[in-house]
């Protein structure tokens, strides 16, 4: 079965990468789908930059690909024959946010959502938190893939 891991991934974190790696072990193909989040401001990275960083960060995973989509997620799953969505959960707050969307997606097309619990070492890690730390010169190594940490640091150095 093919699966999709949707998100804004601005930027992809080691927590995201952990979820994708675990999903890749369970599904024949996993697409990391970079989506626009209407609740978030325009990102640190363009969609194209995010996709490049994700490709570099997942190059070791043969059954993982990267794509983008700007419409209903279930339209993508239908168009590409994908039967599963994979979402990582850090806390009950993530569950409360994701549950209604999972139920609506199932109602619309029958696609199932699989929730994977985040590894405890990444339970507090978010793209937003990593950007905040990096913006003020903090160390984001160990939170982001190495190539991503370098790109984030460079972005913020160029803004000062």
Curated annotation (Swiss-Prot):
Cofactor requirements of the protein: Mg(2+)
Catalysed conversion reaction: (R)-4'-phosphopantetheine + ATP + H(+) = 3'-dephospho-CoA + diphosphate
Superkingdom to which the source organism belongs: Bacteria
Keyword tags: ATP-binding, Coenzyme A biosynthesis, Cytoplasm, Magnesium, Nucleotide-binding, Nucleotidyltransferase, Transferase
GO biological process: coenzyme A biosynthetic process
Compartment(s): Cytoplasm
Disulphide bond pairs: none
Residues holding substrate: 8, 40, 73, 87
Site entry (Transition state stabilizer), positions: 16
UniProt main location, coarse: cytoplasm
Entry similarity comment: Belongs to the bacterial CoaD family.
Record protein name field: Phosphopantetheine adenylyltransferase
Species annotation: Corynebacterium glutamicum (strain ATCC 13032 / DSM 20300 / JCM 1318 / BCRC 11384 / CCUG 27702 / LMG 3730 / NBRC 12168 / NCIMB 10025 / NRRL B-2784 / 534)
Origin organism lineage: Bacteria, Bacillati, Actinomycetota, Actinomycetes, Mycobacteriales
